[in-house]
Amino acid sequence: MKKTYRVKCEKDFQAIFKDGKSTANRKFVIYHLNRGQDHFRVGISVGKKIGNAVTRNAVKRKIRHVIMALGYQLKSEDFVVIARKGVESLEYQELQQNLHHVLKLAQLLEKGFESEEKH
């Protein structure tokens, strides 16, 4: 993922948490904030409750892959994806469906793409 598509610094994370809206399902929480940029930016947070570093990094890679696959469908907002406990045991397909579901709930998918549940 290119640097321009990442939320990295602490003040950006805090601004999204403070001023943004949140949406959640059983496996993910998403905070999002529209800042008027021309493309989306994403931050991924996987806490220590999920597992050791190897497990957390594997979960982050899967999330990153799903986000980049949906890239052209996502609205131009900053958002933070927080993984909840239990996400580490999901297969890729289940993780993809859960993440797609919470993005749809947060209305972060462009119009016309919401009906594409199954890939």
Swiss-Prot record:
NCBIfam families: rnpA. Transmembrane segments: none annotated. The lineage of its organism: Bacteria, Bacillati, Bacillota, Bacilli, Lactobacillales. This is Ribonuclease P protein component. InterPro entries: Ribosomal_Su5_D2-typ_SF (IPR020568), Ribsml_uS5_D2-typ_fold_subgr (IPR014721), RNase_P (IPR000100), RNase_P_CS (IPR020539). Signal peptide: none annotated. GO terms for molecular function: 3'-tRNA processing endoribonuclease activity; ribonuclease P activity; tRNA binding. Disulfide bonds: none annotated. RNaseP catalyzes the removal of the 5'-leader sequence from pre-tRNA to produce the mature 5'-terminus. It can also cleave other RNA substrates such as 4.5S RNA. The protein component plays an auxiliary but essential role in vivo by binding to the 5'-leader sequence and broadening the substrate specificity of the ribozyme. Keywords: Endonuclease, Hydrolase, Nuclease, RNA-binding, tRNA processing. PROSITE patterns: RIBONUCLEASE_P. It holds the Pfam family Ribonuclease_P. Consists of a catalytic RNA component (M1 or rnpB) and a protein subunit. The gene is rnpA. Its EC number is 3.1.26.5. GO terms for cellular component: ribonuclease P complex. It catalyses: Endonucleolytic cleavage of RNA, removing 5'-extranucleotides from tRNA precursor. GO terms for biological process: tRNA 5'-leader removal. Belongs to the RnpA family. It is an enzyme of class 3 (hydrolase). PANTHER family: RIBONUCLEASE P PROTEIN COMPONENT.
